[in-house]
Amino acid sequence: MKNTFIWILKIFIGLIALLLLKTGFMWSFLPETNLEAHNIVTNSNLGLNMIKSEIGSGLFSVALFLLLYVIKGKKWFLPATIMVGLYLVTRTISFMVDGYHPVIVTLIVLEALILVALFALNKLQSK
């Protein structure tokens, strides 16, 4: 019975993860389509909620994983690296597609430096 429940939960969480991957792709690479499909205007209640939820929670997640890695150690290296790496990849692709802005370049450099620092710390701690 316990194993059945474990599998049901894994399937449920896996399906949610797939839905979130699709949603993340849509917001990252087709935001206009997503805004139009859901009738989201950025200065409406829904628009503000989406900005706060999608952007705010993503940044909170990155910050939390970075802090957990620094405080709690190696088991948080992979989540922190993946989160920062996804921000860097998405921002770089968006930069190539949508064009230049000095803030974008600053954030790309900062995210790359964070990744370098994560890998350097991981390497130093494994010696």
Language-model features and meaning:
Residues 76, 89-105:
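Membrane-helix boundary connector in multi-pass membrane proteins
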Residues 17-49:
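Hydrophobic transmembrane helix segments
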Residues 113-127:
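Membrane-water interface at the C-terminal end of transmembrane alpha helices
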Residues 73-83:
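Membrane-interfacial loop-to-transmembrane alpha-helix junctions, especially the N-terminal start
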Residues 1-19:
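Cytosolic juxtamembrane helix and N-cap/initiation of the first transmembrane helix
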Residues 20-23, 83-93:
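Aromatic-anchored segments of alpha-helical transmembrane domains
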Residues 58-66, 87-91, 114:
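Hydrophobic, membrane-inserted alpha-helices
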